[in-house]
């Protein structure tokens, strides 16, 4: 089904969005420069499950905003017109087999030049494999596994927003250095959780702490009470949860109901999005320290963009939404620079490129492993009486510079083919 660009949820969920002609028209692309004389951007993510709020339809909104900003910036000089840019979307249901099938459909049947987003690490690795086989692009924003820039790296895959090393390097190290020496870790038993457990164990140990136990849970999962009881039984300083999205919300609620905070057991959250805080309430997360890739109200530039996003989506953006905007915009900038959708040419343009946009601060696209490094932030959830408006949930404690935030390239294990 094809629809004109629209801001409604129905349009976002329709599967295909064709961006209609802009007022001033614009030049046609160079003869033969673009496959089927158009650019097709796929957004593949969770639109119905535990990650739909942090990603989902609003990631499509962010990509649409990037398209419109590209067209507005270049006007008649844009190498592709609005009529030639198509945004397609699908729900991978957080299942790697579904993600694999949807990626094949996007690349082969729908002509996708690039697939964006793809939360859930197992799903992301499936899509990355398809991208590598088909020599098509995948910019991953939603998943955390370092395998995307490690042993399973590919010339056609870029990891845009965050990863488990970044999260552990910020939160694991800081909490341990501030007195949380004895940890129990609860993690979802799939690629993301396994990678998080490994990264946090390494970070805690390097900071002088110990992980006395790790507990794997099903994914997705509603009831964490048994796992929390087991983790708390040894009297650790910290329970580190590696859940995300709806699973994180369930775990935090049950942690508070069990009174574990009152027992002196802190909760460290490996991965948190602002949508998680909004769903459960700032009082449930008060004082939680975590590492954030971006925050909507961290400066004037981010707030201005977030105000636009609020008008389009009805909510403030998560860092995944901002990351999807950035990835789509930088892809279109590469198309503009090269005047083609040829994947190898786009990769050559992006490799080693320094990037500044609303999401990427001090950004650089590493040619060696395609890890996109950028400044990240140590954040703390505000107390309820500090909140001045809806979505005003975080204090930024400090900035972690790009070169310190991410795994050194010589440790990545990537052998780029």
Predicted regions and their residues:
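Extracellular/periplasmic Venus flytrap/periplasmic-binding protein
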Residues: 98-101, 146-147, 154-257, 294-304
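Periplasmic-binding protein-like
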Residues: 106-119, 139-141, 184-187, 235-245, ...
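Short, low-complexity disordered leader/linker segments with a strong preference
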Residues: 1-40, 413-417
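Extracytoplasmic "Venus flytrap"
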Residues: 31-35, 39-64, 90-96, 119-120, ...
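Extracellular/periplasmic periplasmic-binding protein-like sensory domains
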Residues: 255-327, 336-339, 392-417
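Segments of small-molecule ligand-sensing domains
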Residues: 311-321, 332-396
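Short, polar/charged alpha-helical segment
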Residues: 54-78, 198-206
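Beta-alpha junction/loop-to-helix N-cap segments that form part of ligand/metal-binding clefts
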Residues: 26-32, 55-59, 73-151, 160, ...
């Amino acid at each position: 089904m094809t629809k004109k660009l629209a801001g409604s949820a129905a349009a976002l969920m329709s599967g295909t969005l064709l961006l209609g002609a802009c007022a001033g028209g614009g030049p046609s692309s160079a003869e033969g420069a673009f496959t089927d004389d158009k650019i097709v951007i796929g957004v593949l993510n969770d639109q119905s499950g535990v990650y739909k709020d942090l990603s989902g339809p609003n990631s499509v909104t962010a990509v649409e905003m990037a398209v419109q900003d590209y067209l507005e910036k270049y006007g008649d000089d844009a190498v592709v017109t609005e009529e030639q840019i198509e945004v397609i979307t699908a729900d991978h249901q957080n299942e790697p087999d579904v993600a694999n099938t949807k990626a094949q459909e996007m690349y082969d049947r729908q002509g996708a030049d690039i697939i964006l987003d793809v939360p859930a690490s197992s799903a992301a690795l499936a899509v990355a494999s398809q991208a590598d086989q088909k020599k098509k692009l995948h910019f991953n924003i939603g998943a955390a596994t370092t395998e995307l820039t490690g042993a399973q790296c590919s010339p056609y895959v870029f990891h845009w927003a965050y990863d488990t090393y970044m999260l552990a390097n910020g939160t694991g190290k800081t909490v341990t250095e501030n007195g949380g020496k004895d940890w129990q870790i609860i993690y979802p038993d799939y690629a993301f959780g396994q990678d998080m457990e490994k990264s946090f164990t390494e970070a805690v140990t390097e900071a002088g702490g110990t992980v006395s136990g790790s507990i794997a849970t099903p994914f997705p999962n509603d009831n964490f009470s048994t796992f929390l009881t087991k983790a708390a039984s040894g009297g650790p300083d910290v329970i580190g949860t590696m859940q995300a999205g709806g699973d994180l919300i369930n775990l935090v609620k049950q942690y508070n109901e069990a009174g574990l905070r009152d027992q002196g057991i802190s909760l460290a959250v490996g991965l948190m999005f602002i949508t998680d805080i909004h769903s459960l309430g700032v009082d449930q997360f008060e004082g939680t320290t975590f590492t954030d890739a971006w925050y909507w109200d961290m400066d004037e530039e981010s707030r201005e963009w977030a105000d636009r996003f609020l008008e389009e989506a009805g909510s403030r953006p998560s860092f995944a939404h901002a990351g999807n905007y950035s990835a789509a915009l930088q892809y279109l900038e590469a198309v503009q620079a090269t005047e083609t959708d040829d994947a190898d040419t786009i990769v050559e343009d992006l490799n080693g490129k320094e990037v500044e946009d609303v999401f990427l601060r001090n950004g650089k696209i590493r040619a060696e492993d395609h890890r996109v490094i950028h400044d990240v932030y140590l954040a703390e959830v505000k107390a309820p009486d500090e909140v001045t408006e809806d979505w005003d949930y975080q204090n930024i404690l400090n900035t972690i510079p790009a070169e310190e935030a991410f795994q050194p390239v010589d440790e990545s294990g990537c052998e780029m083919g």
